[in-house]
Amino acid sequence: MSPQTETKASVGFKAGVKDYKLTYYTPDYETKDTDILAAFRVSPQPGVPPEEAGAAVAAESSTGTWTTVWTDGLTSLDRYKGRCYHIESVVGEENQYIAYVAYPLDLFEEGSVTNMFTSIVGNVFGFKALRALRLEDLRIPTSYSKTFQGPPHGIQVERDKLNKYGRPLLGCTIKPKLGLSAKNYGRAVYECLRGGLDFTKDDENVNSQPFMRWRDRFLFCAEAIYKAQAETGEIKGHYLNATAGTCEEMIKRAVFARELGAPIVMHDYLTGGFTANTSLAHYCRDNGLLLHIHRAMHAVIDRQKNHGMHFRVLAKALRMSGGDHIHAGTVVGKLEGEREMTLGFVDLLRDDFIEKDRSRGIFFTQDWVSMPGVLPVASGGIHVWHMPALTEIFGDDSVLQFGGGTLGHPWGNAPGAVANRVALEACVQARNEGRDLAREGNEIIREACKWSPELAAACEVWKEIKFEFKPVDTLDL
């Protein structure tokens, strides 16, 4: 390079490292309707000011890098950079802050959850200047959400397909989750559906193992569905898990499910990946299949309070990527989930417009502009004594899944299904008559036991079962 060239290249450019806050901390910034807004829980290293930590998050998740580069002059950083526009201390925590960051819409590819997360929760989470970092919430602008298809069908279309209204849907995960032959698996599916359940379900790790290949399972489950439908006069379904090692194999399994006339397939959206999930959701809408989503691996990402990503963000991402059901905790069962926090992201899944409400962990007002809703699924350690609470907490637009709470019945699978259906119908009737499920729940169940021996037997088995542990992830109050 000639001396003349060196001189020209250096005009207006000063090499070196400068504080992030000089460029990316902009407390006077007024957010735009088109910005993606993020709330990060930031735990800086000792000696790192909160403004510098928040600015570093904004920089490293958008246009910034660790040093000044001369190619900054070839673009408009002011147009494309992320901006930390507000910082607040976390109640009850020392040296921990909520940093609010605004991202210009042009930073993200349309219709791609994969690209959105690659930027916002990418390398910045390994940044040395931070002891820990957690994404608490996102505000998705309507101009971005409209680039997504969303759920294949949504709540109302699903109810119309199933012809079931005015109550939660009932499901059951077939147990043991691994080890059954396809024929015995299909038998369990039939018994549960025949007993009164709406759905049965593959467990998340049932794919295509040596003891039960996927095609055999699909065939026996389809036979079980048709037999149960013929005997009950109700539409039934089984969540056929299409999750596979490649997108091509996943779609092949979904195609076979459709050819069998199955109403619904299933996907593990975190282990399978957002690209695969969106592809499957598009196929399901085009071909009339409902899509059940399991959140296997979510607790690796969302359970720790100081680092990772809250499930409300994963729930929003799923609604954009596509799914008609998603597991959302139970509040009362064996899995993590504080009541107000759970109800917050349940609303984010189902409702069209959700107001900011920090008492439920909702940092931003979210407008889904008529994107179809997702049914929350309560599953994990629940049984008939939980039915009043589940009906009261989740309401009609939900799926209540009793795996062990069905197949663990002392009389067998079908009586277990009968017990759950009777308990649900009793709770719905009592609620419709104006009774208080929270206060009178146990009495309602005992009354139903008088005319349902199956329910009475279930109540006796599970009368002492409780999961009383404090949740790890709690609201900042």
Curated annotation (Swiss-Prot):
Matching PROSITE patterns: RUBISCO_LARGE
KW Acetylation (keyword) present: yes
Binding-site positions, Mg(2+): K201, D203, E204
Principal subcellular localisation of the protein: plastid
Group of enzyme by EC: lyase
Subcellular location: Plastid, Chloroplast
Active site: K175, H294
Keyword Secreted part of the UniProt annotation: no
Catalysed reactions, semicolon-separated: 2 (2R)-3-phosphoglycerate + 2 H(+) = D-ribulose 1,5-bisphosphate + CO2 + H2O; D-ribulose 1,5-bisphosphate + O2 = 2-phosphoglycolate + (2R)-3-phosphoglycerate + 2 H(+)
Binding site for substrate: N123, T173, K177, R295, H327, S379
Changes after translation: The disulfide bond which can form in the large chain dimeric partners within the hexadecamer appears to be associated with oxidative stress and protein turnover.
Gene3D superfamilies registered for this protein in UniProt: Ribulose bisphosphate carboxylase, large subunit, C-terminal domain, RuBisCO large subunit, N-terminal domain
Record propeptide residues: 1-2
GO molecular function: magnesium ion binding; monooxygenase activity; ribulose-bisphosphate carboxylase activity
Gene Ontology biological-process entries: photorespiration; reductive pentose-phosphate cycle
Cofactor dependency: Mg(2+)
SUPFAM superfamilies: RuBisCo, C-terminal domain, RuBisCO, large subunit, small (N-terminal) domain
GO cellular component term, pick one: chloroplast
UniProt function note: RuBisCO catalyzes two reactions: the carboxylation of D-ribulose 1,5-bisphosphate, the primary event in carbon dioxide fixation, as well as the oxidative fragmentation of the pentose substrate in the photorespiration process. Both reactions occur simultaneously and in competition at the same active site.
Subunit details: Heterohexadecamer of 8 large chains and 8 small chains; disulfide-linked. The disulfide link is formed within the large subunit homodimers.
Protein family according to the UniProt entry: Belongs to the RuBisCO large chain family. Type I subfamily.
Record-given protein name: Ribulose bisphosphate carboxylase large chain
Gene from which this protein is expressed: rbcL
